Amino acid sequence: MSQPELKKSKVDISKTITVLPGDHVGEEVCNEAIKVLQAIEDATPYRNIKFNLQKHLIGGAAIDATGTPLPDESLEAAKNSDAVLLGAVGGPKWGTGSVRPEQGLLKIRKELNLYANLRPCNFASDSLLELSPLKSEIVKGTDFTVVRELVGGIYFGERQEQAESEDKQTAWDTEKYSTEEVTRITRMAAFMALQHNPPLPIWSLDKANVLASSRLWRTTVDKVMSEEFPQLTIQHQLIDSAAMILVQSPTKLNGIIITSNMFGDIISDEASVIPGSLGLLPSASLASLPDTNSAFGLYEPCHGSAPDLTENKVNPVATILSVAMMLRLSLDCVPEAEALEKAVGQVLDSGIRTGDLRGSSSTKEVGDAIAEAVKKVLNQSV
């Protein structure tokens, strides 16, 4: 990773971040992310940066306090911020009733038009290769990003449950996509591919041999790529075949993976196992192309709320790397993002790790170490 290029001229930057800790470990990981943001405020040597942090409720915590998983106050705060940092939502306490924590997450995605979910899959440090459930020689060099369409498809389609009797019930969900939705997510994937030199290849995953929605998906992707991005490489892969490749030889899918809401949900969770822990993987959900490094976005770890995990045991790295994505894509703080990613790698290499990475450090100890490391990286680069 290249060293951040920092200039010495003073520039003032003020950014507002809505923090939605959510449930269980969400509060802990958000606290460590805030710690790192404050360290960057203190350390950035060539400009004054101020992160205005505002905490609000979402998920089960919001249900307990207000009866709704996404209070209007939380939504309005998110709409008026530069970016949103989310911890995790859900847990068995709230069950699967008519009001559920996950409804808050679905609603905020829809209300903020967060149509593109980006989930990188790589190794923050080669020292983590041995932790993968796959052989090191198979996973070494894995580096792809899943670009998942987030506000369409079967999760937002019409659904129905009918019961003629206790023994005879029927239920269905509807998968629906428009050319506009597929065009928009294809452009996001192409933009991400073009941020690299040479540009990254793009893999489009669907089930076009069976589903009408996938056939529309494939023809639309082809049209957009041929007309707008002829310089990029696009390959189509059936989702079941891609799931197999991901286990057999994940580096074959290196580049940008574009897929629908449900397929993206499944394939990105499968991919999250490759680095050895969900506690390592960040994500970003964007409302527009980050072409000026100022796209509005929501950032969260790929892991859930982990209600069974005792205090100070959760790995904060995924949330901290989500902050790095936020700095790069939404807050126009690219040098700070690079410094933070470098700091995370240094800390992991030093052996300061939580239990999921066969370490003995606590959540706070990892957060403290990364905060100190990013200060040193920033100050050394002047």
From Swiss-Prot:
<feature type="binding site">
    <location>
        <position position="240"/>
    </location>
    <ligand>
        <name>substrate</name>
    </ligand>
</feature>
<comment type="similarity">
    <text>Belongs to the isocitrate and isopropylmalate dehydrogenases family.</text>
</comment>
<feature type="site" description="Important for catalysis">
    <location>
        <position position="207"/>
    </location>
</feature>
<dbReference type="GO" id="GO:0003862">
    <property type="term" value="F:3-isopropylmalate dehydrogenase activity"/>
</dbReference>
<feature type="binding site">
    <location>
        <position position="119"/>
    </location>
    <ligand>
        <name>substrate</name>
    </ligand>
</feature>
<comment type="subunit">
    <text>Homodimer.</text>
</comment>
<feature type="site" description="Important for catalysis">
    <location>
        <position position="155"/>
    </location>
</feature>
<feature type="binding site">
    <location>
        <position position="109"/>
    </location>
    <ligand>
        <name>substrate</name>
    </ligand>
</feature>
<dbReference type="GO" id="GO:0000287">
    <property type="term" value="F:magnesium ion binding"/>
</dbReference>
<keyword id="KW-0460">Magnesium</keyword>
<feature type="binding site">
    <location>
        <position position="240"/>
    </location>
    <ligand>
        <name>Mg(2+)</name>
    </ligand>
</feature>
<dbReference type="InterPro" id="IPR019818">
    <property type="entry name" value="IsoCit/isopropylmalate_DH_CS"/>
</dbReference>
<dbReference type="InterPro" id="IPR024084">
    <property type="entry name" value="IsoPropMal-DH-like_dom"/>
</dbReference>
<keyword id="KW-0464">Manganese</keyword>
<keyword id="KW-0479">Metal-binding</keyword>
<feature type="binding site">
    <location>
        <begin position="304"/>
        <end position="315"/>
    </location>
    <ligand>
        <name>NAD(+)</name>
    </ligand>
</feature>
<feature type="binding site">
    <location>
        <position position="265"/>
    </location>
    <ligand>
        <name>Mg(2+)</name>
    </ligand>
</feature>
<dbReference type="GO" id="GO:0009098">
    <property type="term" value="P:L-leucine biosynthetic process"/>
</dbReference>
<dbReference type="GO" id="GO:0051287">
    <property type="term" value="F:NAD binding"/>
</dbReference>
<keyword id="KW-0560">Oxidoreductase</keyword>
<keyword id="KW-0028">Amino-acid biosynthesis</keyword>
<keyword id="KW-0432">Leucine biosynthesis</keyword>
<keyword id="KW-0100">Branched-chain amino acid biosynthesis</keyword>
<keyword id="KW-0520">NAD</keyword>
<comment type="pathway">
    <text>Amino-acid biosynthesis; L-leucine biosynthesis; L-leucine from 3-methyl-2-oxobutanoate: step 3/4.</text>
</comment>
<feature type="binding site">
    <location>
        <begin position="91"/>
        <end position="102"/>
    </location>
    <ligand>
        <name>NAD(+)</name>
    </ligand>
</feature>
<protein>
    <recommendedName>
        <fullName>3-isopropylmalate dehydrogenase</fullName>
        <ecNumber>1.1.1.85</ecNumber>
    </recommendedName>
</protein>
<comment type="function">
    <text>Catalyzes the oxidation of 3-carboxy-2-hydroxy-4-methylpentanoate (3-isopropylmalate) to 3-carboxy-4-methyl-2-oxopentanoate. The product decarboxylates to 4-methyl-2 oxopentanoate.</text>
</comment>
<feature type="binding site">
    <location>
        <position position="269"/>
    </location>
    <ligand>
        <name>Mg(2+)</name>
    </ligand>
</feature>
<dbReference type="Pfam" id="PF00180">
    <property type="entry name" value="Iso_dh"/>
</dbReference>
<keyword id="KW-0963">Cytoplasm</keyword>
<feature type="binding site">
    <location>
        <position position="148"/>
    </location>
    <ligand>
        <name>substrate</name>
    </ligand>
</feature>
<dbReference type="GO" id="GO:0005829">
    <property type="term" value="C:cytosol"/>
</dbReference>
<dbReference type="InterPro" id="IPR004429">
    <property type="entry name" value="Isopropylmalate_DH"/>
</dbReference>
